């Protein structure tokens, strides 16, 4: 399950990203680390995402998170660009990567498995649809922990 602070963090981060021509792709708050780590992946909408994009976003976001007191106590802010193994989260990404190999991880076993590798067919309101060597499968969305591009088809 996503951390309960993530919606507030996203609400704070998205306007800053938009102002810089960036898009927030993924937000993860790892509270099992000391100090906790807030990792935000951003993508430049007009060109390859560079270190400068991440630095500018981080410098503008950090004071806003502090001012709004969203995260209590000390934490580490990591801003990076999504790699090829990034999580697919938006409708746009699921459309753009239709036909690509993906890895789906579930919170609980579905048909006795917690990890599925196949070709992305689509995502709808109810499920993530994959093609597994010619066989179609629909994994209920409420069970899906993450969907990543898979570089090992």
Curated annotation (Swiss-Prot):
Alphabetical list of Gene3D superfamilies matching this protein: Ribosome maturation factor RimP, C-terminal domain, RimP-like superfamily, N-terminal
InterPro entries, per the entry: Ribosome_maturation_RimP (IPR003728), RimP_C (IPR028998), RimP_C_sf (IPR036847), RimP_N (IPR028989), RimP_N_sf (IPR035956)
Major localization class: cytoplasm
Location of this chain's protein in the cell: Cytoplasm
GO cellular component, one term: cytosol
Domain of life the protein comes from: Bacteria
GO BP, one annotated term: translation
Record-linked Pfam families: DUF150_C, RimP_N
Entry keyword set: Cytoplasm, Ribosome biogenesis
Role description: Required for maturation of 30S ribosomal subunits.
Family listed: Belongs to the RimP family.
Protein name: Ribosome maturation factor RimP
Native species: Picosynechococcus sp. (strain ATCC 27264 / PCC 7002 / PR-6) (Agmenellum quadruplicatum)
Lineage per the UniProt record: Bacteria, Bacillati, Cyanobacteriota, Cyanophyceae, Oscillatoriophycideae
Gene transcribed to yield this protein: rimP
């Amino acid at each position: 399950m996503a951390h309960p602070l993530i919606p507030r963090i996203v609400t704070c981060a998205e306007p800053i990203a938009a102002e810089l021509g960036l898009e927030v792709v993924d937000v993860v708050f790892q509270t099992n680390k000391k100090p906790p780590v807030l990792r935000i992946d951003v993508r430049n909408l007009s060109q390859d995402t560079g270190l400068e994009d991440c630095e500018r976003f981080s410098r503008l976001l950090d004071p806003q998170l502090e001012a709004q007191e969203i995260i209590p106590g000390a934490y580490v802010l990591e801003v990076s660009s999504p790699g090829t193994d990034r999580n697919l989260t938006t409708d746009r990404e699921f459309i753009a990567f239709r036909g690509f190999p993906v890895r789906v991880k579930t919170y609980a076993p579905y048909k006795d498995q917690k990890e599925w590798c196949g070709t992305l067919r689509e995502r709808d309101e109810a499920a993530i649809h994959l093609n597994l060597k010619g066989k179609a499968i629909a994994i209920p969305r409420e069970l899906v922990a993450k969907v990543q591009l898979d570089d090992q088809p």
